[in-house]
């Protein structure tokens, strides 16, 4: 279970939100809504431990994330609004490098299969600098195909995707929820997640 208890966020001299509470269990997705500047990305950064809250506490499996360190990170998959890929590397090299840095096992065959699922068959060995923005986004999203960690934090995952890719990603997220995983995401798009319980939290 992921719990937020009485969270407060202050950036500069501006309070973005205060008294924020929620609980998220397996099979649930929390969709963060709100205008630009309402604190959605700041909340995601809090949930992954990069930004300490001004007040309140975040708990994972009943314990504060501040005390869990690597144990919490081992359960967490974070996908930011930036693609976080190396332009000089190929899609295949990017996937294998990301798995290595996360201390995860990912075979070359599984990485190629993931890239095929995101529509990059035949581009596995092309340097990412030659890909379109939508294709680069798909390289980043390919991580989710084989991802087994229970908690996904997704910042605008549908950016730069066409309609078919949006439907594909919604299916990947749905499968994660069906397996008992949970997710928190921000998106400006209307997306149908066919499985799991989708809850909405509006900021601002």
Swiss-Prot record:
Positions contributing to ATP binding: 34-41
GO cellular component: plasma membrane
Example of a GO MF term: ABC-type heme transporter activity
Pfam families tied to this protein: ABC_tran
Keywords of this entry: ATP-binding, Cell inner membrane, Cell membrane, Cytochrome c-type biogenesis, Membrane, Nucleotide-binding, Translocase, Transport
Record-annotated ABC transporter domain positions: 2-203
Subcellular location: Cell inner membrane
Any one GO biological process: cytochrome complex assembly
Function: Part of the ABC transporter complex CcmAB involved in the biogenesis of c-type cytochromes; once thought to export heme, this seems not to be the case, but its exact role is uncertain. Responsible for energy coupling to the transport system.
Organism expressing this protein natively: Dechloromonas aromatica (strain RCB)
Catalytic activity: heme b(in) + ATP + H2O = heme b(out) + ADP + phosphate + H(+)
Organism domain of life: Bacteria
Subunit record text: The complex is composed of two ATP-binding proteins (CcmA) and two transmembrane proteins (CcmB).
Membrane protein topology class: Peripheral membrane protein
Broad class of where this protein is predominantly found: membrane
Similarity section: Belongs to the ABC transporter superfamily. CcmA exporter (TC 3.A.1.107) family.
Gene name linked to the record: ccmA
Name of the featured protein: Cytochrome c biogenesis ATP-binding export protein CcmA
Record-listed E.C. numbers: 7.6.2.5
